[in-house]
Amino acid sequence: MVQRKSQDGKTVMVEQIGSPIRNSRIQHATLKGLGLNKMRRRRILKDTLCVRGMIAKVRHLVRVIDEG
């Protein structure tokens, strides 16, 4: 299995724009894993494949604000 490492300075800022109410427990847990649990809360995360996968699972609940 080949693992790709992120660039040292790469980060991504995400903001929660949707409520996890009426969504599955898995999506609620994914938001929690991203550090998001309230509306309009923002987090700066390392830009890794794992984080990108989590964002993709809840793309209807979050917005990517800044990639840098």
From Swiss-Prot:
It comes from the Bacteria. HAMAP family: Ribosomal_uL30_B (MF_01371_B). GO terms for cellular component: large ribosomal subunit. It comes from Bartonella quintana (strain Toulouse). One of its GO terms (biological process) is translation. This is Large ribosomal subunit protein uL30. The keyword Ribosomal protein applies. Keywords: Ribonucleoprotein, Ribosomal protein. Belongs to the universal ribosomal protein uL30 family. Coiled coil: none annotated. The gene is rpmD.
